[in-house]
C-alpha cells in the first residue's frame, strides 16, 4: 500500500472537497432557495440560518455521519442507510445521494480503488478514512465546503456580494471548528435535527414553478 504523508493528505483532502471536484454541488441549495424566494432568509438573516444548519440541522447530521464513516471498521452500508433515512424529503435525498455517487466515482477513477455509491458524508468518510489526518480536521474542512456551497447559492440569488459572502464564511469558521470537534467524538445517538423550517423549505422547494437550484 502506498504511504501518504500528512502534507500530501491535506492536499488530497483539499482536492476532494474543492468546488472544482465534480460532484455537482453547485446545483443544490438544501431548500435555501425557497426560503430566500419567500423572504424568510435575507442577507441579514443568512448567518443565523447557517448557524442553525450547523448546530441543529443537516450540517450537524453530516458531521456526525462523516465522523462515524471515518472510523476504523465502520459499517459504511449501514451508515449509508442511516444517512438516507435522515433525509426529510425526496430532493434532499437526491442531493446527498447524487453528490455522494459522483464523489465515489471520481475517487475510484483517481485512486483505482472501487468505491460504491453512498450518501455524500458516508462516501467522503470512506474515501478519507485512510488519510493520516485528525478526524476533526477532515470534518472541519467538509463543513466549510458545505457552508461555502450554501453561501454561494445565496450570492447567486440574493443581493449579496461575493466578498460579503466570504466574510460570512470567515465569521462562521469558529463555529465550524467547534462543531467538527464535537462531531469527532459523537456516536449514532447524537444524530438529531431540529431545523423544521429548513426541512419545510426543502419540501416546498419541490413544487416551485421557477427555480435555479435542484433543491
Swiss-Prot record:
<protein>
    <recommendedName>
        <fullName>Urease accessory protein UreF</fullName>
    </recommendedName>
</protein>
<keyword id="KW-0996">Nickel insertion</keyword>
<dbReference type="InterPro" id="IPR002639">
    <property type="entry name" value="UreF"/>
</dbReference>
<dbReference type="Pfam" id="PF01730">
    <property type="entry name" value="UreF"/>
</dbReference>
<dbReference type="GO" id="GO:0005737">
    <property type="term" value="C:cytoplasm"/>
</dbReference>
<comment type="subunit">
    <text>UreD, UreF and UreG form a complex that acts as a GTP-hydrolysis-dependent molecular chaperone, activating the urease apoprotein by helping to assemble the nickel containing metallocenter of UreC. The UreE protein probably delivers the nickel.</text>
</comment>
<dbReference type="InterPro" id="IPR038277">
    <property type="entry name" value="UreF_sf"/>
</dbReference>
<comment type="function">
    <text>Required for maturation of urease via the functional incorporation of the urease nickel metallocenter.</text>
</comment>
<dbReference type="GO" id="GO:0016151">
    <property type="term" value="F:nickel cation binding"/>
</dbReference>
<keyword id="KW-0963">Cytoplasm</keyword>
<comment type="similarity">
    <text>Belongs to the UreF family.</text>
</comment>
<keyword id="KW-0143">Chaperone</keyword>
Amino acid at each position: 500500500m502506498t504511504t501518504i504523508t500528512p502534507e500530501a493528505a491535506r492536499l488530497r483532502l483539499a482536492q476532494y472537497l474543492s468546488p472544482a471536484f465534480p460532484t455537482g454541488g453547485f446545483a443544490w441549495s438544501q431548500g435555501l432557495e425557497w426560503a430566500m424566494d419567500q423572504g424568510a432568509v435575507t442577507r441579514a438573516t443568512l448567518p443565523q440560518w447557517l448557524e442553525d444548519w450547523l448546530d441543529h440541522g443537516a450540517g450537524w447530521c453530516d458531521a456526525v455521519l462523516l465522523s462515524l464513516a471515518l472510523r476504523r471498521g465502520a459499517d459504511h452500508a449501514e451508515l449509508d442507510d442511516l444517512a438516507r433515512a435522515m433525509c426529510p424529503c425526496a430532493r434532499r435525498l437526491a442531493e446527498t445521494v447524487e453528490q455522494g455517487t459522483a464523489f465515489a466515482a471520481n475517487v475510484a477513477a483517481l485512486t483505482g480503488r472501487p468505491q460504491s455509491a453512498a450518501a455524500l458524508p458516508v462516501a467522503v468518510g470512506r474515501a478519507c478514512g485512510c488519510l493520516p489526518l485528525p478526524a476533526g480536521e477532515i470534518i472541519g474542512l467538509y463543513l466549510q465546503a458545505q457552508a461555502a456551497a450554501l453561501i454561494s447559492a445565496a450570492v447567486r440569488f440574493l443581493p449579496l456580494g461575493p466578498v460579503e459572502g466570504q466574510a460570512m464564511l470567515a465569521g462562521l469558521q469558529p463555529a465550524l471548528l467547534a462543531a467538527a470537534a464535537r462531531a469527532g467524538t459523537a456516536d449514532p445517538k447524537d444524530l438529531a435535527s431540529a431545523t423544521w423550517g429548513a426541512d419545510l423549505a426543502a419540501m416546498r422547494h419541490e413544487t416551485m414553478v421557477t427555480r435555479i437550484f435542484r433543491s
